């Protein structure tokens, strides 16, 4: 019998499952090397915690790791039902709020090691969390892709910790009662990008699609389709970072000015950025709430101990 201890939270409605104990020893290398070991040798632990019957396609997992830098508060490896993420904004907010709930950190700024670089996260007195993300940038502007049933679609390719294709002019109604259509549209766009060889820098896969619309309560509302075909309930921290990079590149948002990004369900992040040469350093602020603490059991006699794989 294998057991895994977890602490679940949600950030703006998007769940994070923090793995506290039970995963194999991944060594003492940097976080990226440990992610590689996990994916190549122990991926069944990811599947057990993310896939049904213990997980679902909305969950993002966060494996708590001992950091390399003694000044860091934590290291983290993010993953979901389909694989691994470089960075996760809502997940980092969930991580910090969870560590505070456990009494492991106090109010203040904390260094967090991720597979794509270090980020700073500040736990505020009101329990909200600000994440100073990895450098973000727009890779290409106004990229055209021919999409089956929809014709020519134009969007920007940007990095915010993951690769995004950001679409402003899409002709879709961005509303919570239109999720099936939004999912179908965004998934078709993603398939077209792959089929036509449109990628991020160095051929990296664009695995997030982000649609934007106006909003009465925020500067913008988005719909974000994640790699596993589930939509993001939060405004998406890395997606908001990619959006900020595009706004900065177009001269539509000045450094330090606040941008309020709403999600498809109405939750919000507050974002701003600092200019750093050709990059921007986004800061995303949001709140996370604890939802469950549990121990997962993987019984060797259970045919679905390591998840249902369809």
UniProtKB/Swiss-Prot annotation:
Pfam families the record matches: Pro_racemase
GO molecular function, a single term: 4-hydroxyproline epimerase activity
Entry keyword set: Isomerase
Isomerase is among the record's keywords: yes
Catalyzed reactions: trans-4-hydroxy-L-proline = cis-4-hydroxy-D-proline
Annotated active site: 88 (proton acceptor), 236 (proton donor)
Enzyme Commission number(s) from the entry: 5.1.1.8
InterPro entries: Pro_racemase_fam
Enzyme class: isomerase
SUPFAM superfamilies: Diaminopimelate epimerase-like
Binding site for substrate: 89-90, 208, 232, 237-238
Family, as annotated: Belongs to the proline racemase family.
Task performed by this protein: Catalyzes the epimerization of trans-4-hydroxy-L-proline (t4LHyp) to cis-4-hydroxy-D-proline (c4DHyp). Is likely involved in a degradation pathway that converts t4LHyp to alpha-ketoglutarate. Displays no proline racemase activity.
Name of the protein this chain belongs to: 4-hydroxyproline 2-epimerase
Provenance organism: Acinetobacter baumannii (strain AYE)
């Amino acid at each position: 019998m294998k057991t895994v201890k977890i602490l679940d939270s949600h950030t703006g409605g998007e769940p994070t499952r923090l793995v506290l104990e039970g995963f194999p020893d991944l060594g003492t290398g940097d976080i990226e090397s440990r992610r590689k070991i996990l994916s190549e040798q122990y991926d069944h632990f990811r599947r057990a915690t993310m896939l049904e019957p213990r997980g679902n396609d909305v969950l993002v997992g966060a494996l708590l790791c001992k950091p390399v830098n003694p000044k860091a508060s934590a290291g983290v490896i993010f993953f979901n039902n389909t694989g691994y993420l470089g960075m996760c904004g809502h997940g980092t907010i969930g991580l910090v709020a969870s560590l505070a709930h456990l009494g492991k950190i106090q109010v203040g700024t904390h260094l967090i090691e991720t597979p794509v670089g270090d980020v700073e996260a500040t736990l505020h007195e009101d329990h909200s969390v600000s994440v100073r993300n990895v450098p973000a940038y727009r890779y290409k502007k106004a990229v055209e892709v021919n999409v089956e049933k929809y014709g020519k679609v134009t969007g920007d390719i940007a990095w915010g910790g993951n690769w995004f294709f950001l679409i402003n002019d899409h002709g879709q109604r961005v509303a919570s009662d239109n999720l099936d259509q939004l999912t179908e549209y965004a998934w078709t766009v993603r398939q077209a990008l792959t089929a036509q060889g449109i990628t991020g820098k160095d051929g990296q896969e664009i695995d997030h699609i982000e649609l934007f619309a106006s909003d009465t309560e925020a500067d913008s509302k988005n719909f974000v389709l994640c790699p596993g075909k589930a939509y993001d309930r939060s405004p998406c921290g890395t997606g908001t970072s990619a959006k900020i990079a595009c706004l900065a590149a177009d001269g539509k948002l000045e450094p330090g000015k606040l941008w309020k990004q709403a999600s498809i369900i109405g939750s919000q992040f507050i974002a701003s950025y600092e200019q750093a040469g050709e990059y921007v350093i986004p800061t995303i602020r949001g709140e996370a709430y604890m939802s469950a603490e549990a121990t997962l059991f993987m019984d060797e006699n259970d045919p679905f101990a390591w998840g249902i794989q369809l």
